[in-house]
Structure formats: C-alpha cells, structure tokens
Amino acid sequence: MTAPEAPTGRILVGVDGSPASLHALSWAARQAELTGGSLEVLMTWQWPGTYGWAAPIPADYDPEADVRRTLEAAVEPVHAAHPGVTIRPEVAEGRPEPILVERSKGADLLVVGSRGHGEFVGMVIGSVGEYCAAHAHCPVLVHRPKT
C-alpha cells in the first residue's frame, strides 16, 4: 500500500469564458484563499474543423492570442478580488477534456463549471465535467452557480 500524496494546494480550474466557468473560477479563488492554495487556470483552443472546402484563414489570425486575451480578462477581476492567491493562467492547444485530465496529475482539486441545463447528467454537468469526473487524477468539483 502506498502512502497518499501530500496536498500541494494546487487547484486546477478549466475555463472557457462562459458565465458558468467564470463562476467556477471565482469559487476556486475563494477556496484557494481559504486553504492557502494556488490556482492554475487553463483555457484550451482548437483550430476549427472543416468539411470539404475550407475558407481561407487570414495570415494574421492567431487563435491562441485571442484565447490568451480572453483568459487574461477572466483572471484579472479574480486576481483583484483575491490578491493573496497565486494565479497561473495557462493556454493549451487541444480538446479540454484530455488536457484537463493530464494536468490534474498532482492537483488537489479540479474545478469546472456546469452548463446547468436539463436533468440528464451530460446536460447538468456538461460533457467536459462528466469526462473529468470519470477520468481525473484528483477530486473534481463541477460548480453550478446559484440561479
């Protein structure tokens, strides 16, 4: 039997710019503040898929830079509200589910937002939350804002 890993205080938060993910980020920041933890805030991006003929992509199009700006805009008010919390924004290319699961190694908690629609699991917690809850290497909290 192996001994459990010592807590790191690291809370991984998956955000996509949606109101639900921003509420989850705020919740995670409060939790980090209460526990002396830190936040790793992750936003992913992908090239849009195409079928058949694809429209030309402008040479100056930089989806990673767009995502980075969105992430910075999400993190800024949270950092202002919780200045004592270390927040590391991260951008990664790819689907969010496997990236969040991989990054959950060594984290104490993974927090994602809920879509909050319907009664079925996939509709209540969303596909990313459902995937992470099943595969993450740490506990997962799917945050659903009060309505």
Which residues fall in each region the model found?
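Structural beta-alpha unit
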Residues: M1-P7, A20, L34, P77-L110, ...
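Small/aliphatic-rich secondary-structure junction motif
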Residues: T2-I57, H135
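General small-molecule cofactor/ligand-binding pocket signal
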Residues: E40-L42, R88-A92, L141-H143
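Generic structural signal for helix capping and beta-alpha/helix-loop junctions
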Residues: P48-G49, I99, V121
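Short, hinge-like loop/turn segments at secondary-structure boundaries
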Residues: P56-D60, G106-D108
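A short acidic, glycine-rich active-site loop
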Residues: P58-T70
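Glycine-rich, Arg-bearing micro-motifs that act as flexible, cationic patches
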Residues: L109-A134, P145
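Structural loop-to-beta junction motif characteristic of Rossmann-like glycosyltransferase folds
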Residues: H137-P139
